[in-house]
């Protein structure tokens, strides 16, 4: 584990993929301590990144203990200065393990909410699905000073889920970032293992399947509600707002599945999602893997690399949307390898995904994306390594021009 301060990478100024490098924020320790499940948020008003992860005593989900955070300050030269890791002691409950960080920033009050789940003891997800006995709680902490201090943890299970919890074998949020829509609504992506049928109080085998949904707030985080589940198998998910050419909002959901990702759109800000379908351009491994998606303003043009042609650039104005999407996920069909970035210039069409740009050759796992609108830059956290994706969680920044390069990879 790194201590003190260190300087992170800056995005390529030339679009040369070879220039991009990774900065290790969390690294597996010799005593077995492992860091997993990254989440990233960029606070634009104070030029600060907050990077979250689970701290575990082993790679196993059962050995998750507490959430950790590192603060990164974006400098004028584009580098990021990272403070040392700190444990989030208020984001916990006695006899529960803390998992699945999901931050969202409320711009009006400048309040940062960090959602997570707490799971009783060492109860596994599998055991909850077999017995139908939920041992998971929906929890949240908040900060009004950009993550320097945090409120005590609040258990929102009863107020948000209520009696429906008896139909949920287990559930989780994200993992990864939430989003605030243009209308002010806060969105936390979530999923549940829904119990459709029981026999003698136990779920009927093979009928407990994951379903994605949103948890949302219409009053800037004062109260929270849950939306309706997707009508198709869908697990860990992230969501992004798409603004079409007429200024209408669409909430896009991208969820873990088997074989291919699951996509859906909501026309009512996350209350429910219509017509979930598989995205055949976005491949999944057999058991799937978490992925990250983010929306950003569609550019009118991207400057060409050579100085003489920068004034004109290349026209890229989308005919049907003001928003593009960027998606991050391992690109290998058979194993968690070769982390890639997929660009979608027509996100209201399911076939709009470009072929991926590889950002890490080798073992890759969970990830999270953030966008800096001031500099039109992207940043990400990703699980990666040489022999295993559990070796480290790394940070990297890049530009849209980098994503659109036709070379092989950003970094090897």
What are the roles of these predicted feature ranges?
Residues 2-412:
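Asp-box/BNR beta-propeller blade signature and adjacent active/binding-site loops
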